From Swiss-Prot:
It is found in: Cytoplasm. This is Protein farnesyltransferase subunit beta. Its cofactor is Zn(2+). PFTB repeats lie at residues 180-221, 231-272, 293-334, 346-388, 410-454. Binds 1 zinc ion per subunit. One of its GO terms (cellular component) is protein farnesyltransferase complex. It catalyses: L-cysteinyl-[protein] + (2E,6E)-farnesyl diphosphate = S-(2E,6E)-farnesyl-L-cysteinyl-[protein] + diphosphate. Residues 1-56 are annotated as: Disordered. Keywords: Cytoplasm, Metal-binding, Prenyltransferase, Repeat, Transferase, Zinc.
Length: 514
C-alpha cells in the first residue's frame, strides 16, 4: 500500500486540477507560519565551489503553506496543481519523505510567483522570463580562471567547456567568434597520441572527456578546431575499449557502463569513424566478423532493471541519466521505432520515466524516492522525444500537423525550470532547485530540457525514404512562456544545437579516409 500511494502522488502531475480542500495544518511540509508575516529560510551553499556571486540564498515562505496552498503574489493563471500539496500523501514519515516535504515547501513560493525577489517579472501565466544576459555572464565567468576549490574538478575541465559553450549557444550566443582559437589550443593539449582526449595535459584518455571535447568543438563549429581531432588514433583507441559483451570501457582498464555505449556511439556517428575493428585490437582477434556496434544493443538490454528504468551496469539501480544514454545509443544504432523496442521493454520504461515527474514541483527526479533536480529536465525530459519517435515511427510530412498526445506534463516541467531553476540573484546561471547554487552543469542540462519541452521533435520520412529529425513548435497549443523566452533547438540525441550536428557530419563526410 505504501508504494501504491507514492505512485499515485507522483502520477498526480498528469491531473489538470486537484481538490481545494484544506490540508492538515500540522503537515510536516509546514514551517512556523503566521497570518501576518512571511518567514525566511536562509540556506548556505558553503562547501560548494563557487565562481563568485551570491553564496547565500534567501527563500521566502509565504503564509498558506501550512494549509497546503501558496497564494500567488499577483493575479495570474497558475493551475492549482502547482500551488498546493498533492491530494494523496503517504502517512508514514521517513527521512526521505521529510526531505521531499522540505523541497516542496521551498519550491511552492517560486511556483506561485510569491518568492522573495520582487524584481523578478512574471508573465500572464505566472512564469518568470529567461534572464539571458545574466545567465550568459555567469557562463562566460565559468570559462575564465576559476577559484582555488575548482582544482578538485581539474580532470573535468572538458566538461566545463562543453557545458558552458553549449548553454551559451542554446541562449543564442555566437560562441565561435569568441572561443574558437582558445578552445582549439585547450583541446590540443588534452589529446593523447594514443587516441582520445583526457581531462588535461598528461592525463589518461577517457571516453567521457573525449565526448565532452568533441561536442565542445562541434558547438563552436570551427573547421580548424575540428581538424585537430586525430580520428585514426581515436578510432584505434575505441577499438581497444570494445568489450566482448558488446559494451565499451570508459578508459583502458576502466569501468564498463552504459555511458560508454552512448558516448562511443555519438563519437563514431558524429565524426564518421569506420565501424570496422582495427585488426590488432583484442576485439578483432576475438571475433574478426564483429564491428564497433556488434552486441551494443544487447549490452544496453542487460541494463534494464525490474523497475523498468536503466542502470549504469547490469543488476544496478535505475537512473535517469542512464535511461537517456541507453535511448540515445539505440537511436544511433537504427531507427528508434525498430531498435528501442527490440532491446527494451518500452511499456515498463515509460512507466518508470512517468514516475519521475512530481507534483506540485513539476520537475523530474533521477531515481525512485529521490528529489527533483533541474539537470533531469534533460536526462529524463530528453528521453521523451526518443520515446515518441519509438512509438510513432517515422512519419510522412503530411502527418506533421497531427495533434500530439503528450506523455508528460510539458507545462509542469517548464514551470519548474523557469520558476525554480533560474538563479534570481546577481549571480545568474541555472541550478538544481531553490537553495542550491547555479553551476555550468545544471545550466547546460536545464536549458537543454527547456528546449526539449518547448519544441516537438519527429522523425520525418522525405522523398528519399530516409528518416531525418525535424523540429517544430507544438501545434494549436497556448504556451505558458512568452515567445521571447524561447531558446534554441537542441538535437534530441547529440544534445548540441541541431544545426551544428549537420555541419560537423557534413565536414567529416567530405574528408577522404582519416
Amino acid at each position: 500500500m505504501r508504494h501504491h500511494t507514492k505512485n499515485l502522488r507522483r502520477r498526480a502531475i498528469f491531473l489538470r486540477t486537484t481538490p481545494r480542500g484544506n490540508m492538515d495544518s500540522s503537515s510536516s511540509v509546514a514551517t512556523s507560519t503566521s497570518s501576518s508575516s512571511n518567514h525566511r529560510l536562509v540556506r548556505s551553499s558553503e562547501g560548494s565551489p563557487s565562481a563568485g556571486g551570491d553564496d547565500i540564498e534567501e527563500v521566502i515562505m509565504t503564509p498558506g503553506i501550512a494549509t497546503g496552498r501558496v497564494q500567488p503574489a499577483v493575479s495570474v493563471a497558475i493551475p492549482d496543481l502547482f500551488t498546493q500539496l498533492p491530494p494523496v500523501k503517504d502517512d508514514l514519515a521517513t527521512s526521505t519523505s521529510k526531505t521531499q516535504d522540505e523541497t516542496v515547501a521551498i519550491c511552492l513560493p517560486y511556483l506561485a510567483g510569491s518568492d522573495a525577489n520582487a524584481d523578478v517579472e512574471h508573465n500572464a501565466h505566472g512564469v518568470p522570463h529567461i534572464d539571458r544576459k545574466k545567465h550568459v555572464r555567469f557562463l562566460r565567468n565559468m570559462l575564465r580562471q576559476l577559484p582555488a576549490p575548482f582544482i578538485a574538478a581539474d580532470a573535468s575541465r572538458p566538461w566545463f567547456l562543453y557545458w558552458s559553450l553549449n548553454a551559451m549557444a542554446i541562449l543564442g550566443e555566437n560562441v565561435k567568434e569568441d572561443y574558437a582559437e582558445s578552445l582549439a589550443d585547450t583541446a590540443r593539449s588534452m589529446q593523447n597520441e594514443s587516441g582520445g582526449f583526457s581531462g588535461g595535459h598528461g592525463q589518461t584518455s577517457h571516453l567521457a572527456t573525449t565526448y565532452a571535447v568533441v561536442l565542445a568543438l562541434a558547438v563552436v563549429g570551427d573547421e580548424e578546431g575540428l581538424s585537430l581531432i586525430d580520428r585514426r588514433a581515436l578510432w584505434k583507441w575505441l577499438c581497444d575499449l570494445k568489450e566482448a559483451d558488446g559494451g565499451f570501457r570508459m578508459s583502458l582498464g576502466g569501468e564498463e557502463d552504459v555511458r560508454g555505449a552512448y558516448c562511443a556511439a555519438v563519437i563514431i556517428s558524429l565524426l564518421n569513424l569506420p565501424l570496422d575493428l582495427c585488426k590488432d585490437s583484442e576485439a578483432y582477434i576475438r571475433d574478426p566478423t564483429a564491428n564497433l556496434f556488434t552486441g551494443l544493443g544487447d549490452y544496453v538490454r542487460k541494463c534494464q532493471t525490474f523497475e523498468g528504468g536503466i542502470s549504469g551496469q547490469p543488476d544496478a539501480e535505475a537512473h535517469g541519466a542512464y535511461a537517456f544514454c541507453a535511448l540515445g545509443c539505440l537511436s544511433l544504432l537504427g531507427t528508434p521505432s525498430e531498435t528501442i523496442p527490440k532491446y527494451l521493454n518500452i511499456e515498463r520504461l515509460i512507466s518508470w520515466l512517468s514516475s519521475r515527474q512530481y507534483a506540485p514541483e513539476g520537475g523530474f527526479s533521477g531515481r525512485t524516492n529521490k528529489l527533483v533536480d533541474g539537470c533531469y529536465s534533460h536526462w529524463v525530459g530528453g528521453c521523451w522525444p526518443l520515446i515518441e519517435a519509438c512509438l510513432n515511427g517515422p512519419v510522412k510530412v503530411s502527418s506533421l500537423d497531427v495533434e500530439p498526445q503528450p506523455l508528460f506534463s510539458r507545462e509542469g516541467l517548464m514551470r519548474y525550470i523557469l520558476c525554480c531553476c533560474q538563479e534570481q540573484g546577481k549571480r545568474g546561471g541555472l541550478r538544481d532547485k531553490p537553495g542550491k547554487p547555479s553551476d555550468a552543469y545544471h545550466s547546460c542540462y536545464v536549458l537543454s530540457g527547456l528546449s526539449s519541452a518547448q519544441n516537438r521533435w519527429q522523425l520525418v520520412v522525405g522523398d528519399d525514404d530516409m528518416p531525418a529529425w525535424m523540429v517544430s513548435p507544438f501545434p494549436n497549443e497556448e504556451e505558458i512562456f512568452d515567445e521571447k523566452d524561447r531558446v534554441g533547438t537542441v538535437h534530441p540525441v547529440y544534445v548540441i544545437p541541431e544545426d551544428k550536428v549537420a555541419k560537423v557530419q557534413t565536414f567529416f563526410a567530405s574528408r577522404d579516409g582519416f
